[in-house]
């Protein structure tokens, strides 16, 4: 990659954002980082020259007062301010949004309308209203701006790009099925393993949830994982790419694993304290599957031909690919006309800052190649 300078803005320097900046610092011919924003601060290279660029390897110091001579420091900028700044750069601009902020996601059509390409793991933009989805891609097409969002499903796994390639080359997608949540994968692989480990006693559901929380696999409030909405958003994205006009993640059945009596609790601590009272419910579900020689897993499923999308518990044979998952891995199966009875399967780590950032960085490289 060589030629014209491309100017880069980055929003979000948390888990994924920090890993992305580390990876960016190692890229040969990296774009010129001219905007870096977090919730309370924005740092920019001075206009109109848009130089000096911010060093991604030393991004923390850009927020310090000692660097104020080199950069322009401000409070939090709204999307209009960010779009105005990047659109006036002396070359093509790219915005990397490493947040899950719906306000930023809603502004994607604005950025694209100003010729700013977008790379992001932000699921909100692509799984909220279908109107926003259409607006994003219609605006991109009319302005020659680019949109890449590999890491919205499966972190760094090539899920989105593979499905887009299948569709673009004319394959007919019949069904998509998989374990889309690293958290729920870990919970069920631990709670109901396909093969019992010798010397390891079976754990109660509440114990497995507590262990996952301690290991950092769950959100601070595990209900944000157990309600199934994260999986529903990912399934919405894939269903839309496959050609279904899914209106929102609330427009199809999503099975919540939160006991009805615990849904209204105000604190995560109280939820964790009372969860053991409902262990018998999950035990019964596990035992029912075992009585039929099967295991239970939490999956997302898109029946493209039948136009049916659903998320929830499902039983699988113990020798199935889904039953063989380990740890917090994801697995996504694409059933298509070309691949016949044996689906195209993508499997691997579906969560984690470094692998999610890898998907973002790889998308950025693709955008840079196309813009150059």
Swiss-Prot record:
Summarize the protein's role. Catalyzes the conversion of L-aspartate-beta-semialdehyde (L-Asa) to L-homoserine (L-Hse), the third step in the biosynthesis of amino acids that derive from aspartate (the aspartate family of amino acids), including methioinine and threonine, the latter of which is a precursor to isoleucine; production of homoserine leads to a branch-point in the pathway as it can either be O-phosphorylated for processing to threonine, or O-acylated for processing to methionine.
Under the subunit heading, UniProt states: Homodimer.
Residues bound to NAD(+) are 13, 15-16, 99, 352
Provide the pH dependence.
Optimum pH is between 9.35 and 9.50 in the reverse direction.
Q: What is this protein called?
A: Homoserine dehydrogenase
Protein transport among the record's keywords? Answer: no
The residues that the entry says bind Na(+) are: 150, 153, 155, 157
What top-level class of enzyme does the UniProt entry assign? oxidoreductase
Annotated residues that bind L-homoserine are located at 219, 230
What organism does the UniProt record list as the source? Paracoccidioides brasiliensis (strain Pb18)
Q: Which Gene3D superfamilies match?
A: Dihydrodipicolinate Reductase, domain 2, NAD(P)-binding Rossmann-like Domain
Q: Which domain of life is it from?
A: Eukaryota
Query: Among its keywords, does the record have NAD?
Result: yes
What is the similarity comment for this entry?
Belongs to the homoserine dehydrogenase family.
Q: Binding positions for NADPH?
A: 16, 99-100, 123, 352
A GO biological process held by the record: threonine biosynthetic process
Q: Could you tell me what the cofactor note in this record states?
A: A sodium ion is seen in the structure; a metal ion may subtly affect the relative position of the nucleotide-binding region to influence enzyme activity, and could increase the stability of the enzyme.
Q: Name one GO molecular function term.
A: metal ion binding
Write one Pfam family the protein is assigned to: NAD_binding_3
């Amino acid at each position: 990659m060589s030629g014209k300078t491309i100017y880069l803005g980055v929003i979000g320097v948390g888990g994924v954002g920090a890993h992305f900046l580390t990876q960016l610092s190692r890229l040969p011919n990296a774009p010129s980082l001219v905007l870096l924003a977090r919730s309370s601060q924005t740092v920019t290279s001075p206009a109109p020259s848009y130089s000096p660029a911010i060093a991604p390897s030393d991004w923390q110091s850009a927020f310090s007062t000692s660097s104020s001579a080199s950069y322009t420091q401000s409070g939090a900028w709204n999307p209009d301010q960010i779009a105005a700044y990047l659109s006036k750069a002396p070359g093509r601009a790219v915005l990397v949004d490493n947040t899950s902020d719906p306000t930023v996601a809603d502004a994607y059509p604005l950025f694209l309308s100003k010729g700013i390409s977008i790379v992001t793991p932000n699921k909100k933009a692509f799984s909220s209203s279908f109107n926003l989805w259409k607006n994003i891609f219609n605006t991109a097409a009319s302005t020659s701006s680019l949109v890449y969002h590999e890491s919205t499903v499966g972190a760094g796994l090539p899920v989105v790009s593979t499905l887009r390639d299948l569709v673009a080359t004319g394959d007919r997608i019949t069904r998509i099925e998989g374990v889309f949540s690293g958290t729920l994968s870990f919970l069920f692989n631990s709670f109901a393993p396909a093969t019992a480990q010798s010397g390891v006693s079976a754990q109660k559901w509440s114990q497995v949830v507590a262990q996952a929380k301690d290991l950092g696999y769950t959100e601070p409030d595990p209900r944000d994982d157990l309600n199934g909405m994260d999986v529903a958003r990912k399934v919405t994205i894939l269903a839309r790419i496959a050609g279904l006009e899914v209106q929102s993640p609330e427009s199809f059945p999503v099975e919540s694993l939160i006991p009805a009596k615990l849904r209204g609790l105000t604190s995560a601590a109280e939820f964790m304290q009372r969860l053991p009272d409902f262990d018998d419910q999950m035990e019964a579900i596990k035992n029912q599957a075992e009585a039929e020689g099967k295991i239970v897993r939490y999956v997302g499923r898109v029946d493209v031909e039948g136009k049916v999308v659903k998320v929830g518990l499902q039983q699988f044979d113990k020798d199935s690919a889904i039953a063989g998952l380990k740890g917090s891995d994801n697995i996504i199966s694409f059933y298509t006309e070309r691949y016949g009875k044996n689906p195209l399967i993508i499997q691997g780590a579906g969560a984690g800052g470094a692998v999610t950032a890898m998907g973002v960085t790889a998308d950025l490289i693709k955008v840079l190649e196309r813009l150059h």
